[in-house]
């Protein structure tokens, strides 16, 4: 049980250190990340749709 509590304490200490180093993104950085994510989702969806259409044309069902 002591080993478990030590692991939890260690994890919490490391998490606290990471949270202290990180910063909230600015609006410009947020918009860029949102655009990139949106483009990626559209691209993956388009590829999936193309594969689905090809599969439909090949199998006929």
From Swiss-Prot:
It comes from the Archaea. GO terms for molecular function: protein transmembrane transporter activity. It is found in: Cell membrane. Signal peptide: none annotated. PROSITE patterns: SECE_SEC61G. InterPro entries: Prot_translocase_SecE_dom_sf (IPR023391), Translocase_Sec61-g (IPR008158), Translocase_SecE/Sec61-g (IPR001901). The chain crosses the membrane at residues 38-58. It is a single-pass membrane protein. Essential subunit of the Sec protein translocation channel SecYEG. Clamps together the 2 halves of SecY. May contact the channel plug during translocation. Belongs to the SecE/SEC61-gamma family. Component of the Sec protein translocase complex. Heterotrimer consisting of SecY (alpha), SecG (beta) and SecE (gamma) subunits. The heterotrimers can form oligomers, although 1 heterotrimer is thought to be able to translocate proteins. Interacts with the ribosome. May interact with SecDF, and other proteins may be involved. This is Protein translocase subunit SecE. The lineage of its organism: Archaea, Methanobacteriati, Methanobacteriota, Thermococci, Thermococcales. The gene is secE.
């Amino acid at each position: 049980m002591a080993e478990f509590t030590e692991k939890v304490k260690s994890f919490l200490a490391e998490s606290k250190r990471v949270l202290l180093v990180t910063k909230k993104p600015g609006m410009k950085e947020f918009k860029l990340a949102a655009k990139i994510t949106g483009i990626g989702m559209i691209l993956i969806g388009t590829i999936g749709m193309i594969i689905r259409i090809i599969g439909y044309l090949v199998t006929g069902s």
